C-alpha cells in the first residue's frame, strides 16, 4: 500500500540548494587541490646555472671575447680621423690572447709606442725597458703588426708573418688576404719560403687596401724608392745598403716553382709585376731571374681579378685620387705596348 506524500515547493527549494551546495563543495575541493599542485610546481626551481664570463677586465685596454673566451687587446688612437668617420679616433686591434696578462702587456707596449713613457700602463714601466729600445726602430704600423703576430690567434701560430700559413700537405707556405671584394679571403698562392709569401701578402694588401695597409715589411720597400735612371745599377747599390735586408731571401726557388701549375705561377708573377715595378730591388729580386733580364720578355695577360680592378674606378670603391696615389709612380715605367696589351684583354 502506497501512501502519496505531497512535497511542498519549499521542500523542493531546500533540496535544490543542498544539491547545489554539494556540487560547489566538490568543485571547490578540486580547485584547491589544483592550486596546491600549482603552488608546488612554482616552488620547484632548477639548479642555478654558471654565470657567463665577464667581458670586462681589471686591466686597461683588455676585453674578453664572448664566444672564444680569449682576451682581446685594443687601443684607441685619438689622433686618427678622416671625413668618413663620425667621431675622432679609431680602435686599433692588438690581437687575442689566451692569458689576460698577455693581453694587458700587449696594450702596454702599444701605448708606449703611441704615447710614450708618460702614459698609464697596466704594469710597471721597468718591465718594458728592452721592448722600448726595440720599438724605436719601427714605425707604429710595423710594431702593431709585430704585436698581432705574437698573439695566440694569429695565423694558427705557424708563421711569424701576417697572412702566411703552412700548407698541410706539401709543406709550402701559402699567402692569403681576407675581406677582398666581399670574399672571406683571397688566395695568393704557395711559396717556398715564409718571406716570399709575406711579400705576396704585402703586395696584395697595398693593392686592395691602399697605402694605409698593415704590411709585414716597411711599405717604403715597395712604393717609395726613387725612380732610377738605370734600375739594374740602382738595385745592385741597394743590395749593399742597410735597408736591403730582404735581398737574401726573396729570390724565388725556380726548381720548386716548376711543380706548381702554369696558371698559378702566372697569377703570382703578374700580381707582383703590377705593383713592384716601382721598386727596382724587389722587381729584380722577386720577379726576374738571377741573370740579366731579356730584352723582350714574354707577354702575359693580366688575371681576371686585376682586370676587374682596372675597370672598377667608377664603381665607388676606389676614387681617382686613391688610384693616382697607388699607381702614380708606375707611369714612368710603363710603355705604350703595356696599355695596348691591357686593352686587348
Swiss-Prot record:
Q: Does the keyword Glycoprotein apply?
A: no
Query: Whose protein is this, by species?
Result: Arabidopsis thaliana (Mouse-ear cress)
Q: Which UniProt keywords apply?
A: Activator, DNA-binding, Ethylene signaling pathway, Nucleus, Repeat, Transcription, Transcription regulation
Q: Which family does it belong to?
A: Belongs to the AP2/ERF transcription factor family. AP2 subfamily.
Which residues belong to the signal peptide in this entry?
none
Top-level taxonomy: Eukaryota, Viridiplantae, Streptophyta, Embryophyta, Tracheophyta
Q: What does this protein do?
A: Probably acts as a transcriptional activator. Binds to the GCC-box pathogenesis-related promoter element. May be involved in the regulation of gene expression by stress factors and by components of stress signal transduction pathways.
Q: Name one Pfam family in it.
A: AP2
SUPFAM superfamilies, per this entry? DNA-binding domain
Region (Disordered) residue ranges read 15-62, 243-302
Q: What is a single molecular function from GO for this protein?
A: DNA binding
Q: Which PROSITE patterns match?
A: AP2_ERF
Q: Does the keyword Transmembrane apply?
A: no
Task: From the UniProt record, list the coiled-coil ranges.
Answer: none
Q: Name one GO cellular component term.
A: nucleus
| Any GO BP | negative regulation of seed germination
Q: What is this protein called?
A: AP2-like ethylene-responsive transcription factor At1g16060
Q: Which residues bind DNA?
A: 58-124, 160-218
- Cellular location(s): Nucleus
Amino acid at each position: 500500500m502506497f501512501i502519496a506524500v505531497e512535497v511542498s515547493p519549499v521542500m523542493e527549494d531546500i533540496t535544490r540548494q543542498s544539491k547545489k551546495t554539494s556540487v560547489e563543495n566538490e568543485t571547490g575541493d578540486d580547485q584547491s587541490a589544483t592550486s596546491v599542485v600549482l603552488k608546488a610546481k612554482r616552488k620547484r626551481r632548477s639548479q642555478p646555472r654558471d654565470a657567463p664570463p665577464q667581458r670586462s677586465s681589471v686591466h686597461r685596454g683588455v676585453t674578453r671575447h664572448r664566444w672564444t673566451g680569449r682576451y682581446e687587446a685594443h687601443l684607441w688612437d685619438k689622433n686618427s680621423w678622416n671625413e668618413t668617420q663620425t667621431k675622432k679616433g679609431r680602435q686599433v686591434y692588438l690581437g687575442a690572447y689566451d692569458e689576460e696578462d698577455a693581453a694587458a702587456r700587449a696594450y702596454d707596449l702599444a701605448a708606449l709606442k703611441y704615447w710614450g713613457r708618460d702614459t698609464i700602463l697596466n704594469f710597471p714601466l721597468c718591465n718594458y725597458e728592452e721592448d722600448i729600445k726595440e720599438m724605436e726602430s719601427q714605425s707604429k704600423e710595423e710594431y702593431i703588426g709585430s704585436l698581432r703576430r705574437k698573439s695566440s690567434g694569429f695565423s694558427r701560430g705557424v708563421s711569424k708573418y701576417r697572412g702566411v700559413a703552412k700548407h698541410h700537405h706539401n709543406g709550402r707556405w701559402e699567402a692569403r688576404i681576407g675581406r677582398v671584394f666581399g670574399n672571406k679571403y683571397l688566395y695568393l698562392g704557395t711559396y717556398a719560403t715564409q718571406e716570399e709569401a709575406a711579400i705576396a701578402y704585402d703586395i696584395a694588401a697595398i693593392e686592395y687596401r691602399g697605402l694605409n695597409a698593415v704590411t709585414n715589411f716597411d711599405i717604403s720597400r715597395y712604393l717609395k724608392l726613387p725612380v732610377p735612371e738605370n734600375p739594374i745599377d740602382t738595385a745592385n747599390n741597394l743590395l749593399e745598403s742597410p735597408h736591403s735586408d730582404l735581398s737574401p731571401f726573396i729570390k724565388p726557388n725556380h726548381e720548386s716553382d716548376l711543380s706548381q701549375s702554369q696558371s698559378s705561377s702566372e697569377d703570382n708573377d703578374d700580381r707582383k709585376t703590377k705593383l713592384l715595378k716601382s721598386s727596382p730591388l724587389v722587381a729584380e729580386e722577386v720577379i726576374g731571374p738571377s741573370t740579366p733580364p731579356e730584352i723582350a720578355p714574354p707577354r702575359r695577360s693580366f688575371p681576371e681579378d686585376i682586370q676587374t680592378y682596372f675597370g672598377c674606378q667608377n664603381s665607388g670603391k676606389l676614387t681617382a685620387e686613391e688610384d693616382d696615389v697607388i699607381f702614380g709612380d708606375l707611369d714612368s715605367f710603363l710603355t705604350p705596348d703595356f696599355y695596348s696589351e691591357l686593352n686587348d684583354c
